[in-house]
C-alpha cells in the first residue's frame, strides 16, 4: 500500500486517479498511524513551501517522514520540501535531499513553464533519455 500524506492543498483526485490506473492500492491520511506501514509515501502539494511545512509540523509528521527509511515521492511543492531549505518564504524543510530550493533568476525563462519542450541531458548516463517532455 502507498501512503499519501494529506497536508492540505493538493490535488488528491488527480493523484488517486493515476494510482488507480496503474492498480496501486493507496491510503490518504493526515494521521501517522494510518501511514506508518506503507511501502512508500507520496507527499503531494499545491501551495507554498512554508504552508506545507507548517501543516506537516501541525500534524506532527516532520520527524516521522524523516525517519521513514522507505521511498518518499514529493510532487510539486511536496518535492521542494524534501530539500533542506526553500528560499520561498525562507523556510527550513525536511532535509531528506541536500540542497536549497531557489527561484530561477533568469528573466528570459517563462515561469511556470507549461507545455512540451526538448530536454537534453548533460551527462552521458542519461543521453538516451533526451527528447520531448511535457511540463505541467
Which role does the model predict for each range below?
Residues 42-44:
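Structural motif
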Residues 40, 71-73, 132:
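Structural signature of beta-strand start/N-cap positions in the alpha/beta core
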Residues 1, 26-37:
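Short acidic low-complexity segments
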Residues 67, 101-136:
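Amide-donor transfer/coupling interface in amidating biosynthetic enzymes
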Residues 21-29, 54-56, 116-122:
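Short gly/ser/thr-rich secondary-structure transition/capping motifs
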Residues 2-24:
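N-terminal beta1-alpha1 ligand-phosphate binding loop
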Amino acid at each position: 500500500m502507498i501512503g499519501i500524506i494529506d497536508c492540505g492543498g493538493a490535488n488528491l483526485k488527480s493523484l488517486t486517479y493515476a494510482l488507480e490506473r496503474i492498480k496501486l492500492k493507496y491510503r490518504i491520511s493526515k494521521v501517522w498511524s494510518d501511514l506508518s506501514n506503507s511501502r512508500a509515501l507520496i507527499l503531494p502539494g499545491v501551495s507554498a513551501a512554508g504552508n506545507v511545512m507548517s501543516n506537516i509540523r501541525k500534524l506532527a509528521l516532520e520527524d516521522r517522514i524523516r525517519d521513514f527509511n522507505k521511498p518518499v515521492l514529493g510532487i510539486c511543492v511536496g518535492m521542494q520540501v524534501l530539500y533542506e531549505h526553500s528560499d520561498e518564504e525562507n523556510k527550513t524543510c525536511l532535509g531528506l535531499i541536500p540542497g536549497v530550493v531557489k527561484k530561477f533568476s533568469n528573466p528570459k525563462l517563462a515561469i511556470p513553464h507549461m507545455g512540451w519542450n526538448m530536454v537534453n541531458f548533460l551527462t552521458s548516463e542519461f543521453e538516451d533519455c533526451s527528447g520531448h517532455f511535457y511540463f505541467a
